[in-house]
């Protein structure tokens, strides 16, 4: 641990990922990066999410992606962030689709969500740290973060 930041092992990262259900999918779409919040589960050492046709599928299917999930433990006032980098693939084999449909994937947004995407990781990394008291940053810093020149 350096400067109050603890680098997490892959096992610790997966354990933390299992404690939350929403993460952010980062993909390249046409000529720019984009980020989408998605509900997900950890399954067989990978990340699985359910979505409908559209930009997420177009940007993710078959591509290298990044996926991030974070959380805060109010009891210890420690926060964590886990990043999974790897290839995203549509789940298309019938037995895999059936198995995926039985996972506890509950999207927040209504609408058809008949596509399952699995991110197979190349790299899993994470950090845990103590959350700084807001007074550390002072009133000026808070004001500047909400205004634009």
Named regions from a protein language model:
Residues 53-116, 121-123:
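Short, structured beta-strand-loop surface elements
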Residues 79, 128-132:
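A short secondary-structure junction signal
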Residues 31, 55-57, 133:
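Short, surface-exposed beta-strand-loop junctions and turns on beta-sheet-rich folds
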């Amino acid at each position: 641990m350096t400067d109050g930041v603890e680098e997490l092992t892959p096992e610790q990262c997966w354990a933390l990922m299992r404690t939350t259900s929403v993460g952010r999918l980062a993909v390249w779409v046409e000529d720019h990066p984009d980020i989408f919040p998605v509900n997900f589960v950890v399954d067989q050492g990978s990340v699985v999410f359910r979505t409908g046709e559209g930009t997420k599928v177009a940007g993710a299917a078959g591509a290298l992606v990044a996926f991030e999930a974070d959380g805060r433990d109010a009891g210890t006032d420690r926060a964590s962030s886990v990043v999974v980098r790897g290839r995203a693939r549509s789940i298309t084999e019938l037995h895999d689709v059936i198995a995926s449909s039985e996972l506890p994937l509950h999207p927040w947004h209504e609408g058809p969500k008949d596509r399952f995407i699995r991110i197979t990781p190349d790299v899993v990394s994470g950090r845990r740290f103590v959350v700084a008291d807001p007074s550390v940053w002072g009133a000026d810093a808070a004001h500047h973060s909400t205004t634009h020149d």
